[in-house]
Amino acid sequence: MAIGVFDSGVGGLTVHHRLVERFPDADFVYLADQANAPYGGRPGEEIVELTKAGCIRLFEAGCDLVVLACNTAASVALRRLQQTWLPGYRRETGRALNVLGIVVPTIEAATGLPWEHEAERRGEKVEKLDILGVFSTPATARSRVYEIEIDKRRQDVAVFSEPCPELARMIEAGAPREELKAVIEGHVQALRTRIGRAPDRAILGCTHYEIVADLFREALPPGTPLIRQPEATADALARYLDRHPEFDPGRSGLRRFLTTGEPGAQNSLVETFWGGPLSFEPA
């Protein structure tokens, strides 16, 4: 089998790149739903249906395991698909299939605790000693997944989300770096104003943002730790494959890149990040 990696666009390539480095012999199929990107401003029901369609396309391409390398899809659609759609689809196809996301590994990295751990609540107020900023799409911010799930595990962490409605679209379109820099600086300043100071740590809660992580570092105070989703996801996938040997990621080093958009319409930001051009096939 192959491992499928799904995103609304090219941002998930940041996760895919790290997975390929971590599992160089494994087979991978990447799907970018660029015809519908970005997902961040869409209603929840649309996000669920688009994510389901992407998973089906990757299953049809020979993947048994799909990683949602899209915070919006993972935060809005993953749990619902796992609970209400995937069990029936497994029975229908007779295949052992699963869908994972990048939010769980990110929360594990942010809290230093396994997903299964939830803090005991004793009723007393816990002082918030650690301020964590989350830069994300509007849909991810509306879901409050980071606030809710981190608070379950670390009540001493205060989470502040800063929705960045235009940023993923700009990165997807290959906007000039100076324009991206100005937008990022504006969102960092907006978050600082709301908190009253800079965050102690930050999550780039959209995989597109990893492409311009250096601009976030420049906008944040020097030395502000960034929780890196590609690394956290690769670590989590390694643990998952160890626990589930039935998901064999293959050994031929297959690399396929699919898009629902125009195959030749990839931008220079992606090529710079990847280290060269990528050849996409129509999905």
Swiss-Prot record:
Catalytic residues, chain numbering: 70, 206
Enzyme Commission designation: 5.1.1.3
Keyword vocabulary terms for this entry: Cell shape, Cell wall biogenesis/degradation, Isomerase, Peptidoglycan synthesis
Recorded catalytic activity of this chain's protein: L-glutamate = D-glutamate
Transmembrane segments: none
Binding residues for substrate: 7-8, 39-40, 71-72, 207-208
Pathway membership: Cell wall biogenesis; peptidoglycan biosynthesis
This protein's record includes keyword Zinc-finger: no
InterPro entries in the cross-refs: Asp/Glu/hydantoin_racemase (IPR015942), Asp/Glu_race (IPR001920), Glu_race (IPR004391)
Gene Ontology molecular function: glutamate racemase activity
Entry's Gene Ontology BP terms: cell wall organization; peptidoglycan biosynthetic process; regulation of cell shape
Pfam families noted in UniProt: Asp_Glu_race
Presence of keyword Isomerase: yes
Protein family: Belongs to the aspartate/glutamate racemases family.
Function recorded in the entry: Provides the (R)-glutamate required for cell wall biosynthesis.
Protein name: Glutamate racemase
